[in-house]
A protein has these predicted regions:
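Catalytic domains of carbohydrate-active enzymes, especially glycoside hydrolases
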Residues: 32-46, 168
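Active-site-adjacent beta->alpha loops and helix N-cap segments on the catalytic face
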Residues: 2-4, 24-26, 51-64, 82-88, ...
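Active-site mouth loops of central-metabolism enzymes
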Residues: 12-28, 72-84, 140-158, 234-249
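N-terminal amphipathic alpha-helix/helix-capping segment at the start of soluble metabolic enzymes
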Residues: 1-18, 22-25, 131, 288-293
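Active-site beta-loop-alpha junctions enriched in small/polar residues
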Residues: 17-20, 46-50, 75-81, 104-107, ...
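Short, well-ordered coil/turn segments that N-cap beta-strands
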Residues: 7-12, 39-42, 68-72, 97-100, ...
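Conserved, mostly hydrophobic/aromatic
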Residues: 16, 43, 93, 166, ...
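Active-site pocket-lining/capping segments in soluble small-molecule metabolic enzymes
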Residues: 3, 120-146, 158, 196-248, ...
Length: 293
């Protein structure tokens, strides 16, 4: 039997969602209601490439503000947009009651691995975007982090230099890309501390709903998938109940191991599904109070 740590005091979580299409509205808000019982620190809503989901992102965070007890964080990218266009989105978020923005440069139009060229009148990079957001108001700003190096960086040192710039311009939190080998994250945490970068590093946790899809995405992002993980999911493509049990256990083990290393906050990539994430949070001792009330 796996022995999880008994002391889960001080643990907090947050969740990422993407804005639902019209036909998925009912299931999306049911997911929100389910995970609201866990009392997350915040919930973030993604912003499609090139601003393609701008209106849906805005509508979603507005409803979260007005219809739930949750604190929303709106994602924002600067790819393919002028400063004026990006600033207008920030002002729209503020008018909707959003005080937390996840500032991301965004992927180049050609996708991961292609060359990024800033808009001639736009923000140059994520650090520049952070500075612009902070100039527009007293926002809490989160940014991204890459335990295994950004696909476009030549080294971890270059990543750390970018991280230092983002922190210097006002970012308070760095949410990591998903990873499956904890030492990558812990080494990044140590390097950030050694450089004296004043920013909270939060692990991004991705429960595996489909191992094949996660493997494909990991390959594009440069995220390592341990062979032992492949073994645990082998042959489960057509056994969803068993696959979900394994997925919940794998993610709970990862979170528990990080908690034993002093990590207190966990950010879950939900893929707009409540089942696995809710189960993991209950393993962590979260949500019981509201459920019993």
């Amino acid at each position: 039997m796996i022995a999880f740590a008994e002391d889960t005091s001080g643990i907090s979580v947050s969740f990422e969602f993407f804005p639902p299409k019209p036909e998925a509205q009912d299931s999306f808000w049911a997911t929100i209601a389910k995970l609201e019982t866990v009392n997350p620190s915040f919930v973030s809503v993604t912003y499609g490439a090139g601003g393609t989901t701008r209106d849906r992102t805005l509508d979603t965070v507005r409803r979260i503000v007005t219809e739930t007890s949750l604190s929303p964080a709106a994602h924002l990218t600067c790819v393919g947009a002028s400063r004026a266009e990006v600033n207008a989105v920030v002002q729209d978020f503020a008018a909707a009651g959003v005080r937390h923005i996840v500032a991301l440069r965004g992927d180049p139009p050609g996708g991961v691995g292609t060359r990024f060229t800033p808009h001639p009148d736009g923000y140059r990079n994520a650090a520049d975007l952070v500075r612009g957001i902070k100039e527009l108001g007293d926002f809490d700003v989160s940014v991204s982090a890459y335990p295994e190096r950004h696909p476009e960086s030549v080294s971890i040192e270059e990543d750390l230099a970018f991280m230092a710039d983002k922190a210097e311009h006002g970012a308070s939190r760095a949410i990591s890309q998903f990873f499956f080998h904890n030492p990558f994250f812990l080494r990044l945490r140590d390097r950030i501390a050694a450089r004296g970068i004043d920013i909270e590093l939060v692990p991004g946790i991705l429960p595996i709903t489909s191992f094949s899809r996660v493997s494909e995405f990991a390959a594009k992002c440069g995220a390592h998938v341990p062979p032992a993980l492949a073994t645990r999911f082998a042959g489960l493509d057509n056994e969803p109940e068993t696959r979900n049990l394994v997925a919940a256990m794998v993610a709970a083990e990862q979170v528990d191991a990080l908690r034993r290393e002093g990590v207190k906050h966990f950010h879950f990539y939900t893929l707009n599904r409540a089942d696995l994430v809710y189960a993991i949070c209950r393993v962590l001792g979260l949500g019981a109070e509201k459920k019993a009330a």
